[in-house]
UniProtKB/Swiss-Prot annotation:
InterPro entries: Smg. It comes from Shewanella halifaxensis (strain HAW-EB4). Belongs to the Smg family. NCBIfam families: PRK03430.1. It comes from the Bacteria. PANTHER family: PROTEIN SMG. Pfam families: DUF494 (PF04361). This is Protein Smg homolog.
Amino acid sequence: MFDILMYLFENYVHSEVELLVDQDELTKELTRAGFHQSEIIKALSWLERLADIQEAGTPYLCNHDQQSFRIYTKAEMEKIDVESRGFLLFLEQIKVLSVETREMVIDRVMEIDEPTLNLDDLKWVILMVLFNAPGHESAYEQMEDLIFEQPDGRLHS
């Protein structure tokens, strides 16, 4: 399923090619690309739920304190390793993620049908969430820079 999400993001969304609106046509395209029907359905459902979260028009979280600290459930800790949880905290500290977008990311990660998700995969989920979150264009650009920009020059002398 995650491979399909990556394929769609890289070939349609990130490359700014118009995404096929017709789900049947998109399913056929993904089948021609070599993906299995059951995985295609899961990926498209995942994307629909992401869109539903964005379009709900109601706050994703109610009455939260901006200074609160996120405690992960056992299932979340099993799926999101320490390095990835640290990266989420880092992104909050530098204001790339808000409390709401962090929770959206965790929600989307937990719906991916993989037992664990590595840091590189988490970064792509974050990009997908920020891309689909109205008003977070700047955060999306910052996240893109963190992923794609390579540091100039030597890091150590």
